[in-house]
Amino acid sequence: MTSEKSQVLFPGAAPQVTTDLSNNVVLTTVNDLYNWAKMSSLWPLLYGTACCFIEFAAMLGSRFDFDRFGLLPRSSPRTADLIITAGTVTMKMAPALVKLYQQMAEPKYVIAMGACTISGGMFSSDSYTAVRGVDKLIPVDVYIPGCPPRPEAIMDAIVKLRKKIAAEDMRERGRLQQTHRYYTVKHNLKPVPEIITGKYLESETRQAPPPELAAAIGLPVPPALQTADFKQAEQQLKALQGGV
């Protein structure tokens, strides 16, 4: 009686996976192996600008165990593949955020955390410096609404990002083009002149003292200021005479 190991299979039959082979060999594809390695070792770049980052700091403690997802916080964008934006993004900070994103290695992912990051939050109605959504600057993969969102919501976002990475295909990477960029013509940001030019003390209003101060310390008052003061005094006198 022959054992199963020494049994000779008929070569004309359909190929079958024996029990010994299925118990000792893992069958997969390069694409699945690549996605498994990516989603199991995400290295986030922590980008916190406001109070939402306090909730994210709770993830680093032992209660929520940030490391069980394989996440290793990085301080340099060149070694990170995930950026978590938490807090308000201002017009002045927008170019720095875009530069950090550009320095990250491909493939890279973005998680927008909090209402201020997603839509501007409470600053979206009357603020002239808040960016109304970080997706106007960089492409966002997962949104976390809340003001601020709880650590459990952050964990759920990480799980959703891992599922998204697991469903990716290496052959479609060329189609995933980034459409939202700070320097393109598609954005709705309006260029404004710089406020701090370094020439504030060199301006004419700062070089010459006020006429009241110049007259008090004995400095000569410019004729233009004297004429303006005379006309103003004459108008005040006419107003008083008309009232009488």
From Swiss-Prot:
UniProt-listed Enzyme Commission number(s): 7.1.1.-
Keyword vocabulary terms for this entry: 4Fe-4S, Iron, Iron-sulfur, Membrane, Metal-binding, NAD, NADP, Plastoquinone, Quinone, Thylakoid, Translocase, Transport
Chain sites annotated for binding [4Fe-4S] cluster: 51-52, 116, 147
Free-text comment on the cofactor: Binds 1 [4Fe-4S] cluster.
SUPFAM superfamilies: HydA/Nqo6-like
Localization: Cellular thylakoid membrane
Class in the EC hierarchy, top level: translocase
Cofactors demanded by this protein: [4Fe-4S] cluster
Gene3D superfamilies: 3.40.50.12280
Swiss-Prot/TrEMBL GO biological process terms: aerobic respiration; electron transport coupled proton transport; photosynthesis, light reaction
Gene Ontology cellular component annotations, sorted alphabetically: plasma membrane-derived thylakoid membrane; respiratory chain complex I
HAMAP family recorded: NDH1_NuoB
PANTHER family membership: NADH DEHYDROGENASE, NADH DEHYDROGENASE [UBIQUINONE] IRON-SULFUR PROTEIN 7, MITOCHONDRIAL
Protein name: NAD(P)H-quinone oxidoreductase subunit K
